[in-house]
UniProtKB/Swiss-Prot annotation:
UniProt KW DNA-binding keyword: no
GO CC, alphabetical: cytosol; Golgi apparatus; membrane
Topology of this chain in the membrane: Multi-pass membrane protein
Ranges in the topological domain labelled Cytoplasmic: 1378-1409
Organism per entry: Aspergillus fumigatus (strain ATCC MYA-4609 / CBS 101355 / FGSC A1100 / Af293) (Neosartorya fumigata)
Residue ranges of BNR repeats: 61-71, 378-387, 438-448, 479-489, 721-731, 816-826, 1104-1114, 1145-1155
Protein name from the UniProt record: Vacuolar protein sorting/targeting protein 10
Protein purpose: Functions as a sorting receptor in the Golgi compartment required for the intracellular sorting and delivery of soluble vacuolar proteins, like carboxypeptidase Y (CPY) and proteinase A. Executes multiple rounds of sorting by cycling between the late Golgi and a prevacuolar endosome-like compartment.
One Gene Ontology biological process: Golgi to endosome transport
Main location: Golgi
CDD domains: Sialidase_non-viral
């Protein structure tokens, strides 16, 4: 009986054990799926087990069960097969995802991949920009973007939908893409701006006239640019627009944009909470440099930004902002970054205030030691303090973002408090392959070793399960832990794989993981494992299985406060034998309030932290209550400067109350007294005999922080002086060192180089605050070549051209290259001429392109060859075997070489891409049999302005000005008899800031000059308002400065042969920087000259001025004065030229009234009047010598106290109290249309009592585009303008070869029969008159393609033939009747521009000049520079023998605006004389 019961009991026990084994498994359930192509994109739909996976062959797969089963998505029409290139999930709508196709067809799902709808967009998905931009409030609104990029320039085409792509509409074309203003659900939350912001779109668009990144603008539209195609430019800085917008981004409640001006690497970061009020982010004096900032994961109440500090070592500084994103506090120095801008930084998920950061321990030795020593640290108080990670008493260092080997977050997940990482203990972080897996279950306070070796890892079931897979080669097993990583178990896989990805649901609440790898055996088979841990526990956790866990602890181990509360979670205990098993239910934090403390407050608007961080100080004088502060000793109750951080939940009662009002002294609010006159400050130089011509402003660009006005200069004795306050105080940082030359960095306005006569040299990159010496490989050259050449994009790349063997008879020049600002040098070439970097934005792949002249076979008796190389001359290409000179200007490289058919003459060749050169075709009416010199005057983006010397007889030099087409090869005549001097400089100057206005002096008696010599030269000044197409005499004012008549009169506002205004030009200036106009004082010009038949001597000159771009002039002072503009024309200063004085005159109303100011107690001889090159300062500097003591002195004259406020600008097309919209015009056109459009500029009203305070004034808008007229065309090649304004073929010359385009492009289908006209590249006109394309014909052998393209058959053929015939007959009759049958014989009249006169003898179709060639003129002005004679100019080049210190390729409008009129600054290779050198010409050759 007992035996029987024992047997029964045993069987029952076995049965119970069997049931228990079935309920609780020891291993997860693993399901595998194989794929022929590698999965490369995988994502979950939030709160589901639905996964989308994209494979390399373009197929899309979906799984609805966490990856156990997969099916291919074919789409509604089956066209998704092998057509999907990328998957984008909607960040704010968990039901939507988008599959972007390789072509123009794409798909959307709105039900988590169950069904798909196709849509088409007329553009490919963008590759270098975000293809999809999502709306933060309305998930049906999406912007789709496509892009086309060439080098650094991109064209982005944006489209938009408001109904999830049921309909798609074009948005606009831009330079940097478009974004919704509401880029995140939290943006403008609580501001009641729903109606205003609902449809607002912001776009980064090109400058109105300059297609370069430094001119990009940020505009917005509230109706998708329907009512205004251009949009409204945003006032970002102090109520002013900003140019140079690089990027924009939505970061939770912040909208951020970055801007960079030309000439600096410093970025300006602007932040807004509503797109209306913007503030520049203040980094406490720290510079944010180009490509040097990374927006990191941010909170609802602050942004984290890492700023690059050392590009060579890739280290940065971590900053945290206040709640409005305007003031940033430095948290961590020397953060570890990679070259892509990724930063080793991560916030612990869902826990406020805990941050893991890696820093570089040996940051100051990285370059020398060639290896970073990275260490890890953690913060528990939102980055205010950091401490080491510890495993027991050992320091732990973990691999972070820059070396992450998985996807998603690096260390943490929504699993409360669980943190993992791969790393090592010791002094610093070792290689990833040498690391092991470590885990913490208290949010990083303590750590323990988990597994040996590197692993990929993931968290599941809110941390109940941790899974890991080896990341060291191939493996066939996984590891897992169900007790927070204390104990680990392993499970075998079906295949041995190389793991690529381990992931799970984004909220880490699932018990299913997904592992992707490739099989070791084949390498081409790819496996996706679904690993399900549901069976490892048989029960679901109950209340007693959870603990209340404090998320943050202070240094005493107590729960810590952040943002006014403590944070807790109910978390599963590590040893609980259960699973939470609540999929897609995120752990909810528990908040308990704290009393308010110091950490809960931040500085209020218009306050910043003091240096010790303990108080907030005002950034501007405070405004006291009415009736208070009658004297400085009074006090008043005012703001403390603190405010409670928005969103902070601390309890006021019993806590700190830092934001209560405090008693403040009135001395803090009384602003600096304003003055009714300027303030002068003199500095005497007792030991100097003379100022040299070498002085330069290191001007701050618009995106630069700081407000110093730095001037550097040399005395004639080689003493170097620096002033940081515009000459109020001077210092000698290199006292005792004799400096031979100053070479400002042409592309980086904070930098300059100082050269001596030997190998010692110095550089500064911080605006002359510090200098560092370096040793050049050889002394500066003695052949008049540029000593230094600079790279346009890499500020530390240099070419040094120096002298070799000059004491041994074989004196020649060698060129060396440095990529670290002279620390190391490598030989480029021996026996060289000029060498330059030729990298340009319009030349893709030209980053390392260098051009050099070199004597053939390294022998100076041979010809100079022109070579190029893209690998530092490891190999090179010979472009010309006998290149006399070459000049780089904008996008053009222009070469003067000997004519093979006439060795005494030159030919010009031009290249745009730096690879292919084409011979320049000069017009036949410029008959110069022997061409000895060309002066490159101007190249404004789309054309070259060239002076061809006709006569080089000393004292009687002159030539013809010709202009090119857009590729610089085909020229037409613009003006004859333009005067030049013996050095090749031409009396030619473009007006800065205005399109098409230029002034030139011509010789009116060429025949007499040729016979009698220079004594007979009679000069007249002419002006053009349409870029050289039509020239006219300057109209004189009616009265002189004393109100007396000039004795001659003008008719209809035109100058006449006997009565016009004449101005002394460039060739007569003492300082080439003294230009007529200013890039910031739009419309203003000044000059000295006389009224009469011809230009008289300087002794008879008076001072004249125009306010309307040269249309009307007035006499402002009798006698000769020097002038300068300040505050963009708000103040103008003049001082007598070269005669004793102690008084200057200034005007605050654009010259209507002039006030005297005595700047010195003793009379002085003033040599020079200067200010910052952009003419935006309110300080001026007089350079002179005291008459009695003969001492040199500078006098700073400060006008800033004359006005108290800044002018208020409205940037929506409206005028304001302080500004009006001004439109340039042609004096004889009524519609203000120039180059196919009407421009509008903001100009301050002369009566406004305020300052512009604007560093970069620019075109407000293109008011409108105009229809095309005759003025939008010029004569085609081999055609010349007739007296009546029409174009006719030059007798004896053939028409252009129209079929050439077919031969050059074998795929071309058609060509156009040539006409007498070609469209000006600069014009933006549309519709109207078409003169350049009349008859289209098929290319040879392309007749079928041509017919298909044009669809000529049946009825179409009838209309194609009949309509032109009827139209021609109608026009022919109309023209015959109106033109009296006199084709081509039209006189110029006064009724041009009216509709009745459209085809009349006065019609603009025929009266406008023919030779208009484009140039985007906001690129502004061009002054003649001479390659062979710059050493003789007074512009401050190095004179070591006959050398120039450097060459300066022309950049664009910004460089002109920043360095107006300075040949040294503008470019000595942009405006050059391309001629035969003295040493190279035969005895009968003349220069």
């Amino acid at each position: 009986m007992i035996t029987r019961w024992l047997l029964i009991t045993s069987f029952l026990a076995l049965a119970i054990l069997s049931l228990s084994s079935a309920a609780k498994k020891s291993e997860p359930e693993i399901t595998s799926s194989s794929f022929d192509n590698e999965p490369f994109s995988l994502s979950y739909f939030e709160d589901t087990e639905t996964i989308l996976m994209n494979t390399r062959d373009g197929n899309l797969f979906r799984s609805f069960d966490g990856g156990k089963a997969w099916e291919q998505v074919d789409g509604p029409d089956g066209k998704m097969k092998k057509a999907v290139r990328s998957i984008w999930q909607h960040p704010f709508d968990k039901n939507k995802a988008y599959a972007l196709g390789a072509n123009r067809r794409h798909w959307v799902t709105k039900d988590q991949a169950k069904t798909w709808e196709s849509f088409e967009v007329d553009g490919y998905a963008a590759a270098q920009h975000e293809p999809l931009i999502f709306h933060g409030w309305d998930s049906a609104k999406v912007i789709f973007q496509s892009d086309e990029c060439m080098g650094r320039l991109c064209i982005v085409k944006s489209y938009y939908t408001t109904d999830d792509f049921k309909t798609v509409s074009p948005l606009r074309v831009s330079a940097g893409g478009c974004l919704w203003a509401v880029g995140h659900p939290q943006f403008a939350d609580g501001l009641n701006l729903e109606d205003e912001l609902r449809d607002r779109v912001l776009c980064i668009v090109p400058g109105l006239k300059v297609p370069s990144a430094h001119a990009n603008r940020l505009v917005y539209s509230d109706d998708f640019f329907r009512s205004d195609a251009e949009g409204t430019e945003l006032n970002i800085q102090h109520g002013r627009p900003v140019s140079g917008i690089l990027s924009a981004a939505a970061v939770k409640k912040f909208f951020v944009t970055a801007a960079k001006s030309q000439g600096t690497n410093e970025l300006a970061l602007y932040v807004t909470l509503d797109t209306k009020a913007w503030h520049r982010a203040d980094f406490g004096g720290h510079r944010v440099e180009q490509d040097g900032y990374t927006l990191l994961e941010s909170t609802n109440y602050s942004m984290q930004v890492d700023v690059l500090t050392s590009p060579s070592s890739n280290t940065g500084v971590l900053f945290t902002s206040n709640s409005n994103g305007t003031y940033f506090t430095r948290n961590v120095e020397h953060t570890n970054r990679d070259r892509f801008g990724h930063v080793d930084f991560e916030k612990i998920a869902d826990i406020q205030g805990i941050v893991l950061v890696n820093t570089v321990k040996n940051w100051d030795k990285v370059e020398s030691e060639n290896e970073k020593k990275v260490v890890s640290s953690i913060s528990f108080d939102d980055g205010r303090t950091f401490q080491s990670l510890k495993v027991g008493d050992k320091q732990l260092h973990l691999h972070s973002v820059t070396t992450f080997a998985n996807t998603g977050r690096v260390f943490s997940s929504p699993a409360p408090g669980l943190v993992m990482g791969v790393g090592n203990t010791g002094d610093h972080l070792k290689k990833y392959s040498e690391g092991s897996l470590y885990v913490s279950d208290d949010a990083g306070v303590t750590w323990r070793h988990a597994l040996d070796g590197p692993f990929k890892y993931e968290f599941g079931d809110q941390g109940s399960v941790i899974m890991a897979v080896s990341d060291k080669g191939t493996t066939d097993e996984i590891q897992f832990s169900i007790d927070h990583g204390k104990e680990w178990h392993s499970t075998k896989l079906q295949h041995k794989i190389n793991p690529k990805l381990l992931t799970t649901t984004p909220d880490s609440t699932s018990l299913t993981f997904l592992l992707v790898g490739s099989e070791e055996s084949s390498g081409t088979k790819h496996v996706v494992y679904s690993i399900d841990f549901h069976g490892l526990h048989e029960r679901k956790c109950e209340k007693d299985d959870f603990e209340k866990w404090a998320a943050r602890l202070n240094e005493n181990g107590e729960p810590d406060c952040l943002m006014g509360h403590q944070q807790f979670f109910n978390r599963r205990k590590a040893n609980a034998d259960c699973f939470v098993d609540e999929e897609f239910k995120d752990p909810q934090p528990i908040f308990e309030p704290c009393k308010c403390s110091f950490e809960d407050f931040e500085c209020d608007f218009n306050f910043v932290r003091s240096e010790d961080g303990k108080s907030c100080v005002p950034t501007a004088p405070l405004v006291p209550p009415v009736g208070r502060c009658q004297k400085q000793t009074d006090t008043f109750m005012g703001p403390s400067g603190w405010r409670l951080i928005p969103g902070n939940t601390c309890t006021r009662e019993g806590g700190e109350n830092l934001d209560k009002v405090v008693e403040r002294p009135c001395k803090d609010v009384v602003s600096a007294p304003s003055h009714d006159k300027p303030m002068a400050q003199k500095q005497v130089f007792n030991d100097a005999r003379q100022f040299s011509e070498q002085y330069y402003y290191l001007e701050r660009q618009a995106s630069s922080s700081g407000d110093d006005e730095t001037v550097i200069m040399l005395t004639s004795e080689g003493e170097f002086w620096v002033s940081h306050d515009h000459g109020k105080n001077w210092e000698q940082p290199l006292k005792g060192v004799k400096i031979a030359a100053i070479v400002p960095h042409p592309y980086y306005s904070d930098g300059a180089f100082l050269l001596t006569r030997d190998k010692q040299a110095f550089w500064t990159v911080d605006r002359a605050y510090t200098f560092k010496s370096f040793e050049a490989p050889i002394p500066p050259n003695q052949e008049g070549l540029p000593v230094l050449s600079f790279h346009p994009h890499y500020k530390d790349w240099l070419i040094w051209t120096g002298a070799v063997d000059c004491s041994h008879g074989d004196c020649h020049s060698d060129a060396y290259f440095s990529k670290n600002r002279g620390e190391n040098w490598d030989l480029l070439l021996r026996y060289v001429g000029k060498c330059e970097f030729e990298s340009r934005e319009n030349r893709p792949g030209s980053e390392k392109l260098i051009f050099c002249q070199q004597y053939e076979n390294e022998n100076k008796k041979n010809h100079l060859q022109l070579l190029s190389s893209e690998n530092l001359f490891s190999d090179s290409h010979v472009h010309f075997n006998d290149a006399i000179r070459y000049a780089t200007m904008s996008e053009y490289i222009i070469v003067a070489s000997r004519d093979p058919d006439n060795p005494d003459s030159l030919i010009a060749s031009v290249s745009v891409d730096g690879k292919t050169f084409a011979r320049a075709e000069f017009p036949s009416n410029v008959d110069v049999p022997v061409k000895t010199a060309f002066t490159v005057l101007d190249s404004s983006t789309h054309a070259v302005f060239l002076h061809v010397t006709v006569s080089d007889v000393k004292g009687a030099e002159y030539g013809s000005i010709i202009k090119s087409n857009s590729n610089g090869t085909s020229y037409v005549l613009s003006l004859n008899a333009a005067s030049r001097n013996e050095w090749g400089y031409v009396d030619f100057e473009k007006m800065q800031g205005l399109e098409g206005v230029a002034v030139v002096n011509i010789i009116s008696n060429v025949d007499a000059v040729q016979k009698k010599g220079p004594a007979a030269k009679k000069l007249k000044t002419m002006i053009t308002h349409n870029d050289g197409g039509q020239w006219m005499l300057l109209p004189p004012p009616a009265k002189d400065a004393d109100g007396k008549n000039f004795g001659c009169s003008v008719k209809d506002g035109k100058g006449s042969d006997q009565c016009s205004l004449h101005l002394h030009g460039y060739t007569e200036r003492r300082d080439p920087r003294d230009t007529f106009s200013s890039g910031s004082a739009i419309g203003l010009m000044m000059g000295i000259g006389n009224v009469g038949a011809y230009l008289s001597g300087k002794d008879e000159a008076d001072t004249f001025m125009t306010r309307d771009g040269g249309i009307t002039w007035k006499s402002v002072k009798k006698g000769r004065y020097m002038w300068e503009y300040g505050d963009a024309g708000s103040v103008i200063v003049i001082v007598p030229e070269l005669r004793p004085t102690k008084v200057l005159y200034y005007s605050l109303d654009e010259g209507d009234n002039w006030e005297p100011y005595e700047f010195s107690e003793v009379e002085m001889h003033i040599y020079r009047l200067s200010t910052v090159p952009s003419d935006t300062s309110k300080n001026f500097l007089l350079w002179g010598k005291e008459m009695e003591s003969n001492r040199l002195a500078t006098i700073n004259v400060d006008f800033s106290g004359l006005r108290k406020k800044s002018c208020i600008l409205v940037e929506d097309g409206q005028e304001s109290d302080d500004y009006y919209l001004w439109e340039p015009k042609h004096p004889f056109q009524e519609d203000n249309c120039l180059f196919g459009h009407v421009e509008q500029y903001h100009r301050k009203k002369p009566s406004s009592q305020c300052w512009n305070n604007w560093r970069e004034p620019h075109v407000h808008s293109i008011g409108r585009n105009c229809t095309c007229t005759r003025a939008d065309y010029e004569c085609n090649y081999n055609y010349e303008p007739q007296n009546d304004g029409s174009c006719a073929l030059v007798p004896g010359l053939p028409k252009p070869d129209a079929l050439a385009v077919c031969r050059e492009d074998p795929d071309r289908v058609e060509y156009w029969e040539p006409t007498a006209y070609r469209r000006i590249p600069q014009t933006t006109c549309s519709g109207g008159l078409i003169l350049d394309h009349v008859v289209s014909k098929p290319c040879p052998s392309k007749e079928k393609e041509y017919e298909k393209k044009h669809g000529i058959s049946g009825t179409g053929l009838f209309f194609a033939i009949m309509i032109p015939l009827v139209a021609a007959a109608g026009v022919g009759y109309y023209v015959y009747a109106r033109w009296d049958g006199k084709f081509g014989q039209i006189r110029l009249g006064e009724n041009a521009g009216t509709y009745e006169g459209l085809l009349s003898r006065e019609s603009p179709i025929v009266t406008a000049p023919i030779a208009i060639i484009a140039g985007i003129v906001a690129v502004i002005r061009a002054l003649p520079l001479l390659a062979m004679s710059l050493w003789r100019s007074a512009s401050g080049y190095v004179r070591l023998g006959r050398n120039r210190a450097y060459s300066r390729p022309y950049a664009s409008r910004g460089s002109f605006a920043a360095r107006r009129g300075d040949y040294t600054s503008v470019v000595d290779d942009e405006d050059e004389l391309l001629g035969v050198d003295d040493a190279e010409i035969d005895d009968d050759d003349e220069l």
